[in-house]
Amino acid sequence: MEEVGIPSIETWTEAQRALLRQLILRGQQTIAELARDQAVSVPFITKALNELIASGWVCEVGRKENYARRAPRLYFLNAKRAYFLGIDMGHLWMSLCICDLCGTIIYAHSRMAFY
């Protein structure tokens, strides 16, 4: 079920998809790092990033450390935006796991299956 006012994944631009892939693969990044790795301008990345922030998929997570000047902001996936459920039904055992968007395990359980 889609939330009101939040675009579905199918309507995302290629830039938004590329940003999410980059954040998944590389972790927390600044706008400058995102722009450099995508080989596009900072304003282009800023626009796509702001759209993802507005829809709740990305959030600011702090500032980069060890900077002589003003430290740039770091962005990462909003872990609470989506959850995944994995179920493994074996012949004798059943296991399930729930994790957030960042891969942190929220719940895991295994037990012997009933016949």
Name each model feature, range by range.
Residues 1-37:
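Extreme N-terminal segment that seeds HTH/winged-HTH DNA-binding domains in transcriptional regulators
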Residues 36, 53-54:
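Alpha-helical residues within the helix-turn-helix
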Residues 43:
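Key DNA-contact positions within bacterial/archaeal DNA-binding proteins
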Residues 49-50:
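Short, hydrophobic-biased segments on the C-terminal half of alpha helices
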Residues 56-61:
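A short, conserved structural fragment
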Residues 62-68:
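Short, basic, alpha-helical segments at the C-terminal edge of helix-turn-helix-like DNA-binding modules
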Residues 71-107:
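Gly/Thr-rich phosphate-binding beta-strand-loop-beta motif of the actin/hexokinase/Hsp70
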Residues 108-115:
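N-terminal phosphate-binding loop and adjacent alpha-helix
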